[in-house]
C-alpha cells in the first residue's frame, strides 16, 4: 500500500485542501491520502491556532464519505513541535510494509532544506509537490519528486479566519459540515 501524507495545521480545512487531496488520490498511484493534523508547526505561530482536537473534528467531517481520504492524528502523541522526519519514522515503525510519500506545496518544497533532516526526507521519500499552473502530474528531474498540477483556489486558512473575524461569509470556502460546525461553535471569532 502507498499512502500520501498531507501535513498541515488545517486551521481550518478548506475546499482548497480537499481539491488537492482528491486530485492527488485520483491522478497518482497513491492508494490513500492521509490528512496529518499538526498540533504545532515549528515554522508557524501558535496565535489563533484552534485546539488540535477541534481541527481534527473539522477534518473528519470534511472528508466523511470519501474512502480514499483519511485523517491522521499521529502527531498528537509525539513531542511538540512536530517534525516531519520524526512522524515519518514513527509511522514506518507502526505500519511496516506501507510506503509513505509526502504531499506538500511548492513553497514548502523550496524551504525543505530548512526542515529538520530535510535532505534525508528528499532522499528517502517520494514528494508530491502541488503547483499553481499546468494540467497534469509529471515527474521532475529528481526521480522522487512529482510536480502535481492540481486545480487550486487562491484561498488559505488564514483568509478563511480573516473572513470569519470580519463577519463575512465563508459558506463556499469550506464544506457545509465544516461551515455549520464553525458557525455553531463560534470558532475563529
Protein language model regions, located:
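Nucleotidyltransferase catalytic core that binds NTPs
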Residues: 1-189
